[in-house]
Amino acid sequence: MALKPIIVIPARIGSTRLPQKALAEIAGKPMIVHVAEQAKKAAFGRTIVATDHHDIAKAVIAYGHECIMTSSHHESGSDRIYEALNHIDPERCYNTILNVQGDLPTITPHEIISALRPLKNSLTDIATLGAKIVEKDEKTDPNVVKIIGTPLSQNRLRALYFTRATAPYGDGPLYHHIGIYAYRREALEKFVALKPSTLEQREKLEQLRALEHNMRIDVEIIDTIPLGVDTQYDLERVRKILA
């Protein structure tokens, strides 16, 4: 079946480490607008921001992007995009949903497109991205999520686990997980119907819910790592990059 993708960018106002980060100014524009612009350049067709706050919606619409209001009570970004999808596509025109996190202002269209590649395998439920870790301090940084996976090819892993710890042990590369997901629509529906899992709650990583329920996640390995904004330090780094 041909993939018919839509990009949905979840953006909530609440953030414990960096309050209201979606609206943080970077090179004259809110961070969420930078992400929406890059997603639109991927040229899949429709790109929409799903948010829980009118200030974010106003900012997104002011720059000419589509936005939809969603509940403020969602447990995860995937739950938010599922609500948005049901509102905007009740006819089920889209069978593939790309969840591009709203705190990746340096993401490129190429990286977004790369997230679709693992779905060429019909056995894959969810696709995502990773990159080899080259900075020593990132190997022990709990904010850098690592992928434990079995190689399928030179640029592809089947994910077995995701962790904030330094893993796997021993010689060999470590891989940094990049927060973009491409879901088959049926996989997203299954995922959001599941209760948060034990390891998901322990690691605070929603993708573990899928693995704990035997869903298959394949990872496309790319050469670059878009900078995620979780802290004020990250924000200042991004401001210098995009200045």
Curated annotation (Swiss-Prot):
GO biological process: CMP-keto-3-deoxy-D-manno-octulosonic acid biosynthetic process; lipopolysaccharide biosynthetic process
Main location: cytoplasm
Reaction(s) this enzyme catalyzes, per UniProt: 3-deoxy-alpha-D-manno-oct-2-ulosonate + CTP = CMP-3-deoxy-beta-D-manno-octulosonate + diphosphate
Disulphide bridges, residue numbers: none
Pathway the protein contributes to: Nucleotide-sugar biosynthesis; CMP-3-deoxy-D-manno-octulosonate biosynthesis; CMP-3-deoxy-D-manno-octulosonate from 3-deoxy-D-manno-octulosonate and CTP: step 1/1; Bacterial outer membrane biogenesis; lipopolysaccharide biosynthesis
Keyword Membrane: no
Transmembrane segment boundaries: none
Any one annotated GO CC term: cytosol
Enzyme class: transferase
CDD domains membership: CMP-KDO-Synthetase (cd02517)
GO molecular function, one term: 3-deoxy-manno-octulosonate cytidylyltransferase activity
EC number: 2.7.7.38
Keywords for the protein's UniProt record, in alphabetical order: Cytoplasm, Lipopolysaccharide biosynthesis, Nucleotidyltransferase, Transferase
Database matches in SUPFAM superfamilies: Nucleotide-diphospho-sugar transferases
Family membership: Belongs to the KdsB family.
Function field: Activates KDO (a required 8-carbon sugar) for incorporation into bacterial lipopolysaccharide in Gram-negative bacteria.
Protein name: 3-deoxy-manno-octulosonate cytidylyltransferase
Species per Swiss-Prot/TrEMBL record: Bartonella quintana (strain Toulouse) (Rochalimaea quintana)
Gene name of the record: kdsB
